[in-house]
Amino acid sequence: MRACLFISLFLFAFSFPSLAWQHQRATVDTIPGKNDLVPFTIRLPKYPLPGRDSAKNAAPRKNLLAFPFAVRSLETNWGLGGIAARFFKPGKQDSTIRTSDVNVLGLYTLRNQLILVLSSTIYFPKEDHILRFQASYSYYPDDFWGLGDHTEFTQKTGFSQKQYFINPQFLKRVHHNMYIGLTYEYQHTGPVTYPADGVFDKEDITGRHGGNTSGIGPILSWDTRNNAYSPDHGGFAEIQYEYFRSFTGSDFKFTLLSIDLRKFFYLSPKSVFAIQGLGGLTFGNTPFRKLEELGGTDMMRGYYGGRYTDKCLMAYQAEYRRFLFWRIGIVAFAATGEVASSPGRFELDGFHYTGGGGLRFALSKEEKLNLRVDYGVARHSNAFTVQLREAF
């Protein structure tokens, strides 16, 4: 285990000179989730949010970045991959806007999972408009426990499925740090390969035979964080609503509503307290790949991504972050959450709990870009993960 961790640290450290100028690529809080792309394996190169950036006015020292990386999670075991990114500014150079980018990423894991991703963010003059784009292909052996908040561990069923995904988004500034926008999402999934007479057939799971989901909807985003990667004060709030119908090209008729709220409290020059709340609702004939899921490397660390799955979700987490010395820091975190078949079916005794701690290694002290090593503990489960960027 120590040898594997050393390899991961080495790969990230090797790319440090290039990573130091990646400030224009903020974390993506609105990119496709587990069911769209890759079940909570890595923090992909993400769409910069329309908030403030700690080094917004600085021009990159280079316009091309390429480096290898290693990741680990319950869902993937260890994975190796590489990323290449091109940075540019459309038209005339403008130091008042962030740099646009195009990223290509590939990942292969010890569970024979393959993920290929193309993503891009383009900033228009004065950042009054932002265009985001993401496309991906994935072949993903995974696990499923059925629907509900009280599924037994023994219900676990292995399956595999191919997915194609595309998601353009367009945002327009309406007031200071407030943006409104439009998102379109298309996903094609092949038939699920799974054991006969398993949970997929017993529960008549929607989407197990594959199909197309195609939907459109609005985005409302507000961001006052002072740093894209690891803020020490400010807040973030985003609401997305997506409408899937036959006239949009979807084989399934359903709607999605998601809410993401975050707040960061400055305690001292070396410590920060952060909290997050997530909410999700789906209505209609929702395929299982678009349902709400509990677990993963970001929320409810310690549980497998999708350990509990249903139409509605609420989850909360808190994290204390402390810088120690040089590039080293520590964190302690706790989370709780549950899923339900409808908003009225949430129960006080239905919450699941996780907790844990981790180490941080600053790849870029200026931009607060960290390598994250976490160990989460949950009921009948625990997880050791190595990721790039904070959980939130």
Predicted regions and their residues:
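Bacterial Sec-dependent N-terminal signal peptides
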Residues: 1-30
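Outer-membrane beta-barrel initiation region
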Residues: 21-133, 207-230, 323-329, 339-343, ...
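C-terminal outer-membrane beta-barrel translocator/porin domains of Gram-negative envelope proteins
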Residues: 216-221, 225-326, 330-333
